[in-house]
Amino acid sequence: MLIFPLINDTSRKIIHIDMDAFFAAVEERDNPALKGKPVVIGKDPRETGGRGVVSTCNYEARKYGIHSAMSSKEAYERCPKAIFISGNYEKYRTVGDQIRRIFKRYTDVVEPMSIDEAYLDVTDNKLGIKSAVKIAKLIQHDIWKEVGLTCSAGVSYNKFLAKLASDFEKPHGLTLVLKEDALCFLAKLPIEKFHGVGKKSVKKLHDMGIYTGQDLLAVPEMTLIDHFGRFGFDLYRKARGISNSPVKSDRIRKSIGSERTYAKLLYQETDIKAEISKNVKRVAALLQDHKKLGKTIVLKVRYADFTTLTKRVTLPELTRNAAQIEQVAGDIFDSLSENPAGIRLLGVTMTNLEDKVADISLDL
């Protein structure tokens, strides 16, 4: 029995762009000697006593089973010849900005999901090009010619299918999913490939005998809702290629933050304050980029024993002034009870964000 009507908007033209092994690709571009070698973005475990995690890695390293969020120690054990690079996140952010400017040539309806991926609605694009596939090819060409990097593209009538399509043929692939092909495309996919279906849901689906899109398609809507609640409603529609979520070019950010984990524990106040300052500068730069001001400053401290303290202060006025944020973050740290254990993580976050007002100038 169908609980809610199925409304499927197939009139849109959506592109999902996903940069190929982005951080590692930037490093290879800037150091051609790395090409063809397994490259891991993360601290070298031989220098950190085995601590640290993999941020990302190139396709050569993935042949050894290395993946993001894996411990650096395990990555080294899988591939002792891997080249570990700590990463230059300011450089990656600059390259990401270049890529976003390329997107904007074609449409202003761009929804960045992270530094290396974004959705574009090109239904009504700036150049009046009718073919979304042609636009995707032009974007791939522009990024390669101007930035020296490859990306994969997925094209379809909604974000869900475009995202799946971009992951279908990597690296440097382009996959189109038409409305008449959607059910066949989804039927063959393992359920864990469905974007938005996490590990816990995958296990639950497997327990129900659901392993592929075809299996999911056969399950009644009410059964899915009984097992998954509101998410069951979404699953029923995703199995049918239905997802009407718009591309949101003005995604609302609830917070902007920066945190760092330290392989070598911090003990000295001067070192701690210096690291707080680095985080603050990163936050201030992000506030500037996103044209945001904030009122609440949050300091996060994690000690060697994994005790984590979070404390916040709300200011009377909006700000994005780095010196002001740093002063408050430093005061918050000074107010914490002394802990002889070294610090392994520091984070600074700005919340209660609002759009920048033209007559406020607090970033001098």
Swiss-Prot record:
EC number(s) given by UniProt: 2.7.7.7
A GO BP entry: DNA-templated DNA replication
Top-tier EC class: transferase
Coiled coil regions, renumbered to chain: none
GO molecular function, one term: DNA-directed DNA polymerase activity
GO cellular component: cytosol
Keyword terms of this UniProt record: Cytoplasm, DNA damage, DNA repair, DNA replication, DNA-binding, DNA-directed DNA polymerase, Magnesium, Metal-binding, Mutator protein, Nucleotidyltransferase, Transferase
Record localization: Cytoplasm
Domain UmuC: residue ranges: 14-198
Cofactor: Mg(2+)
Primary location group: cytoplasm
Site (Substrate discrimination): 23
PROSITE patterns assigned: UMUC (PS50173)
Catalysed reaction, written as an equation: DNA(n) + a 2'-deoxyribonucleoside 5'-triphosphate = DNA(n+1) + diphosphate
Pfam families: IMS, IMS_C, IMS_HHH
Binding note for cofactor: Binds 2 magnesium ions per subunit.
Residues where Mg(2+) binds: 18, 116
Nucleotidyltransferase listed as a keyword: yes
Domain of life: Bacteria
InterPro entries membership: DNA/RNA_pol_sf (IPR043502), DNA_pol_Y-fam_lit_finger_sf (IPR036775), DNA_pol_Y-fam_little_finger (IPR017961), DNA_polymerase-Y (IPR050116), DNApol_IV (IPR022880), PolY_HhH_motif (IPR024728), Rev_trsase/Diguanyl_cyclase (IPR043128), UmuC (IPR001126)
Assembly: Monomer.
Family: Belongs to the DNA polymerase type-Y family.
Function according to Swiss-Prot or TrEMBL: Poorly processive, error-prone DNA polymerase involved in untargeted mutagenesis. Copies undamaged DNA at stalled replication forks, which arise in vivo from mismatched or misaligned primer ends. These misaligned primers can be extended by PolIV. Exhibits no 3'-5' exonuclease (proofreading) activity. May be involved in translesional synthesis, in conjunction with the beta clamp from PolIII.
PANTHER family per the UniProt record, alphabetical: DNA POLYMERASE KAPPA (PTHR11076:SF33), DNA REPAIR POLYMERASE UMUC / TRANSFERASE FAMILY MEMBER (PTHR11076)
Name of the protein this chain belongs to: DNA polymerase IV
Organism: Streptococcus pyogenes serotype M1
Gene behind this protein: dinB
